[in-house]
């Protein structure tokens, strides 16, 4: 997560909210904000670095990467997954692609990467979800300014799972 934060308490008066509303309805008191020069792939790199602190995985272990984002690097080309492929020094044989989804992206992405890995007999894959909403959100919009921040996650799927995915139910 980016280190910079914006307090939702600081926006209470602007949007006519109470402290109780912020705590109990919004559910969090601050949103993370990326640095102006940070791109989506930079947030993914940080998530990867955090993952490596707890799991012994190297770039050479990775067979595939999916990046789920609605806010890709730059203007969208090359795809964020291709940029991330280079930044992480992944093998040339590593398959990478993006999925453009928002809130439902993690569930769909997990279903896609699970199926993709099974079909191609891959042993290790990474699912990144990353969205720097500060690139597109209107900070004067009460409905989104206090809800959407910037961040990235990564989920490691390998042949030694701690948890297993069951059947996915959509709808």
Question: Where do the protein language model's features map onto the residues?
Answer:
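Condensing-enzyme catalytic core mediating Claisen C-C bond formation in acyl metabolism
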Residues: 1-37, 141-171
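Phosphate/pyrophosphate-binding loops at sites that engage ATP/ADP/AMP, CoA/4′-phosphopantetheine
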Residues: 47-63
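Short glycine-rich or small-residue beta-strand-to-loop segments that form or flank ligand, phosphate
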Residues: 64-71
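Short beta-strand segments
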Residues: 68, 100, 125-131, 157
């Amino acid at each position: 997560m980016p280190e910079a934060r914006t307090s939702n308490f600081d926006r209470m008066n602007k949007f006519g909210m109470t402290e109780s509303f912020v705590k109990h309805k919004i559910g969090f008191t601050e949103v993370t904000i990326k640095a102006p020069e940070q791109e989506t792939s930079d947030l993914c790199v940080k998530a990867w670095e955090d993952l490596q602190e707890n799991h012994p995985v190297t770039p050479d272990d990775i067979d595939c990467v999916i990046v789920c984002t609605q806010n890709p690097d730059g203007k969208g080309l090359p795809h964020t997954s291709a940029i991330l492929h280079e930044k992480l020094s992944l093998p040339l044989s590593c398959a990478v692609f993006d999925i453009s989804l928002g809130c439902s992206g993690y569930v769909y992405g997990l279903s896609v990467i699970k199926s993709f890995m099974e079909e191609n007999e891959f042993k290790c894959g990474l699912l990144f979800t990353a969205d720097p909403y500060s690139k597109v959100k209107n900070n004067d919009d009460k409905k989104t300014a206090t809800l959407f921040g910037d961040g990235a996650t990564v989920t490691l799927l390998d042949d030694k799972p701690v948890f297993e995915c069951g059947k996915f139910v959509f709808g």
